[in-house]
Amino acid sequence: MQTLKFLISPVVLLLLITGCDNAVTPESAPEPAAEPMVTTTPLPVYNFPSETLLGLWIETAQACYAEAELSYLEFDAKTQEFLDAPSQTRLRQLQSAWATAHQHYAACRIFQQPTTGDSEGLALFRNQLDSWPIMGGFLDAVPEYPDTGLINDGVIALSVATLIEQHQLTDSTEVTLGFHALEFLLWGADAKRSYTDFMPYASEMSPMGFDTNRENRRRLVLTDLVALLLQQTEQLQARWLPSGTLAEMQALTPQKQTRFMLQSLSGFL
């Protein structure tokens, strides 16, 4: 699996970076002790050019995001197929596509560290994309409370703006965005979600002019969350265009480039 390559690559980079940072030059090597007399084989001195490390880092980041994008697009395609003709088989396929997309997102987290700025912007992205744990009942029904959640709230019109506004409104577990909100929609509270929960029905319009049918609202939330996920992951990937993180990294001194990569690795591992 290609994802494993991206998980292994950071480990290799860590070894390279550690070798660079800890390299012992002949000038700084300590004098050998006079006693006892021991014959040893000198350790090799690793002195990789910073351009090599930076190039490998950038190449891995861009490849990771490119493969992740394919998984997001596949997830979007499976979502549309499922909503067009809901069935238990298509729901299982959609759940599998979610798992693959989330796995790829997790593999690319190492490349989400800020370089010189915008740490708040990146933190917001991560918060909206991968918040955990979640209180599922804030979004949709749970067995003990079958009429709870935004989806079943007949006085709130659902939209992307509403979902963003309601996300962690009063508590960090009140999650209405990202992978785990989608996970709850697709599996339900007891992992026994039925495709019938997404069947389209005739609209049940409220006096305020929006649909209150829970299945239709669940379909709408699924559509909106996937669309927003694609938009946000695309923005993360765009950071590695020449005008984004790539330019910021290239502007750093070799020492700061190495420090940045090492800090990113330590935060990931």
Whereabouts are the PLM-identified features?
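N-terminal non-cleavable signal-anchor helices
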Residues: 12-13, 25, 39
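Sec-dependent bacterial lipoprotein signal peptides
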Residues: 1-18
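Bacterial signal peptide processing site
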Residues: 20-24
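Mature extracytoplasmic or organellar-lumen-exposed domains after removal of signal/transit peptides
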Residues: 32-269
